[in-house]
């Protein structure tokens, strides 16, 4: 069953097409990876999905609802969360504080309730804390929960950003170069986390990634982009053996 669908998306910058008539669908519970050389249009596509960029043509559907005109700040409320290649964390806040901020989109109490810490506000805070602690346990971040972000190794910071995305209870998780900057051991761990996110939490994942060994291990299907157009979509072995993909992406 299709959870997410892109139909005929075109994006132009100054007359240059960054994406040209791109269409694909992602099944519920799938790990779907987008690959391609630098400048292929991968980040542009993620920015269109996140509603940061406005396409000149095409539609985006999530849960069969057209979200093409949805405001960027409302995307997370629909159940779509995203991590970034360049980490977007609060350096002088703790891991716990960063994760609690990931729950702010669900805030239902007003400022007055917050100031006087009313029963409703206390109940909401308790619910937020329970969810955050679940995610901390899930990603094995207990040791770092009260540590400031600026005191953490890069690999742990990446995990914290993933955790913050999970704190929004997404149905769809967008991962932008999740293995970038990680050691081999950390990349292996990331693969296990992703499979757990898929199988245990039931979250669908769309990922941009350059590490083809990692891509082939974790992906259910792969889409290859080049110069803003789709070269191929298929299973990892199909993409690995596709002549056009080898030429464009692997230089063979």
Predicted region positions:
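Glycine-rich phosphate-binding loops of nucleotide-dependent enzymes
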Residues: 2-252
């Amino acid at each position: 069953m299709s959870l997410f669908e892109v139909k005929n998306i075109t994006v132009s910058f100054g007359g240059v097409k960054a994406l040209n008539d791109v269409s694909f669908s992602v099944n519920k519970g799938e790990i779907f990876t987008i690959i391609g050389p630098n400048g292929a249009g991968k980040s542009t596509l993620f920015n269109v999905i996140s509603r940061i960029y406005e396409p000149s043509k095409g539609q985006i559907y999530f849960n069969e609802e057209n979200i093409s005109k949805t405001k960027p700040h409302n995307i997370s409320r629909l159940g779509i969360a995203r991590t970034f290649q360049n980490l977007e964390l609060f350096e002088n806040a703790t891991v716990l504080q960063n994760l609690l901020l990931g729950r702010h989109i669900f805030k239902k109490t007003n400022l007055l309730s917050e100031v006087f810490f009313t029963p409703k506000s206390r109940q909401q805070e308790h619910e937020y804390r329970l969810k955050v602690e679940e995610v901390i346990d899930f990603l094995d971040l207990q040791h770092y929960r009260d540590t400031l972000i600026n005191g953490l190794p890069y690999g742990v910071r990446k995990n914290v950003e993933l955790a913050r995305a999970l704190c929004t209870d997404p149905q769809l998780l967008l991962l932008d170069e999740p293995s970038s900057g990680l050691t081999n051991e950390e990349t292996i761990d990331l693969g296990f986390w992703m499979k757990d996110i898929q199988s245990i939490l039931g979250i669908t994942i769309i990922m941009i990634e350059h590490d083809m060994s990692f891509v082939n291990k974790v992906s259910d299907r792969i889409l290859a982009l080049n110069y803003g157009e789709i070269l191929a979509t298929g299973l990892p072995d199909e993409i690995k053996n596709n002549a056009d993909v080898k030429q464009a992406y692997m230089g063979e």
